[in-house]
């Protein structure tokens, strides 16, 4: 016997988190951080053929203070890493990061001293998108998966703990120069 029985039909019960998640997922404002060829595919996804506006991402923001999702598209150089972190820090909470392409995810074919081997060494990444470069359809699919993640993400201390865990894991990660692999 709860409150559900006392309410008239047609009244929807939900949590504030559920409602806020539903609203947040429908109004992503992306900050574009296009660094290489993946940025061309990202721009294509905003055009009339693919129309990201259908998913609430109508305008790519030039200001990080107006954005809540950062799409890092392409390789990140060592000199660009502090700028990327500064832009991430300027974004208001809650914020999410999508690493678009192999270069943003793992450094790609640029396994050298000048390129960061994965943007997750600089900012916490919520979604990785493979491909070189990934097609606009793949970007839209990743955004829809990020929508689902955002809708079911708990607010407040839970999200802060998740970000702290991601940043700690990135700082503890072994530098790529010390890893043994195909290119070493």
UniProtKB/Swiss-Prot annotation:
It catalyses: a quinone + NADH + 5 H(+)(in) = a quinol + NAD(+) + 4 H(+)(out). It is a peripheral membrane protein. Binds 1 [4Fe-4S] cluster. Its main location: membrane. [4Fe-4S] cluster binds at residues 37-38, 103, 132. It comes from the Bacteria. InterPro entries: NADH_UbQ_OxRdtase-like_20kDa, NADH_UQ_OxRdtase_20Kd_su. SUPFAM superfamilies: HydA/Nqo6-like. NDH-1 is composed of 14 different subunits. Subunits NuoB, C, D, E, F, and G constitute the peripheral sector of the complex. This is NADH-quinone oxidoreductase subunit B. The gene is nuoB.
